[in-house]
Regions:
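Ser/Thr/Asn(+Pro)-rich, low-complexity disordered segments
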Residues: 1-186
Length: 186
């Protein structure tokens, strides 16, 4: 649509930042909004597909540099609703903000299940599978729906688990799954 084209034009004309060797637009990048757009819009603009790939690659590069899983999105956390920015509107990278506050917070980011499933549906990589296994070992049984996520900590006994089961998480997981099923049948 013209609206999504305008957003992409603005994003790609804003300059670039480099994070762990991956170039990203210097525009506000949140995983939920990006992947919802990719999975829900028909006839995706190639720039949207490229942007999703760059965001994925930046997560993998972050892991390769730090050995810590991240799957930046937005949602519940142990300190309230948060926004995990891959890139903030002013060009900072890998920043977490509590909703309603205009400053960054220092906390282990939540590895959001919905973002991990998005990575799996699009790329089915070893990195995405390993992150999914990490969450599977950390979270409650998904028989009533998938929990939001958990932070990264080698010691499972002190991981901050976000056990809430919500429509935003499960809706994006379903959209990612449907996208993967449809894409594999093409």
């Amino acid at each position: 649509s013209d609206f999504s084209s305008t957003i992409l034009n603005n994003s790609f004309s804003s300059g670039n930042v480099t994070s762990y060797g991956v170039s990203l637009p210097r525009a506000g990048l949140l995983g939920d909004r990006l992947f919802c757009s990719l999975f829900e819009l028909n006839n995706n603009d190639s720039r949207l597909i490229t942007l999703a790939r760059q965001v994925y690659l930046s997560h993998e590069a972050y892991y390769n540099a730090t050995s810590a899983f991240v799957a930046f999105g937005e949602g519940n956390s142990h300190i309230g609703y948060i926004y995990e920015w891959v890139v903030t509107p002013n060009g900072d990278t890998w920043k977490v903000m509590v909703a309603g506050k205009g400053e960054y917070t220092s906390m282990n980011p939540v590895i959001y299940n919905k973002i991990v499933f998005s990575f799996l549906s699009l790329y089915n990589s070893t990195f995405a599978r390993d992150m999914a296994v990490y969450l599977e070992q950390s979270l409650p049984d998904p028989s009533n729906g998938y929990s939001d996520g958990a932070d990264y900590n080698i010691d499972i006994s002190i991981r901050n688990v976000i056990p809430m089961v919500g429509s935003n998480t499960n809706g994006l997981i379903l959209a990612a799954s449907l996208y993967a099923l449809h894409s594999s049948s093409l």
